[in-house]
Amino acid sequence: MIANCLNDKPLPVYGKGENVRDWLYVEDHCKAIDLIIRKGRVGEVYNIGGHNEMKNIDIVKLICKALDKPESLITYVTDRKGHDMRYAIDPTKIHNELGWLPETKFADGIQKTIRWYLDNRDWWEEIISGEYQNYYERMYAGR
């Protein structure tokens, strides 16, 4: 989304964008995985969640606003059949057993993520110019 927004490309949003996801900053996710590897019980499953559920459309609009881009870039595409409206993550176990909680507030994490895209444009533009672009076009063509 951020790359498309920076390049003034369509921002595909499934259905009306009402799908809810639990958002977590990548460094918090990595720290949780590291903690599980070091202190988790072998064979156990630990859900990693941010306690931060938001609608997809709200995230996309937030990105547009942060980058001073028009919401007219948002393109509503046909939702996948059977697409879940909400992905709920219950991270109670990792908190209770390992003491993990996310450290980064959503507002800070999204700003850091956007800043990363701005500071590393050469890197990610090379990636999306190749095979990924072909995949992206196959996935969203005609939707």
Describe each region flagged by the PLM.
Residues 2-143:
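C-terminal substrate-binding subdomain of Rossmann-fold SDR/epimerase-dehydratase oxidoreductases
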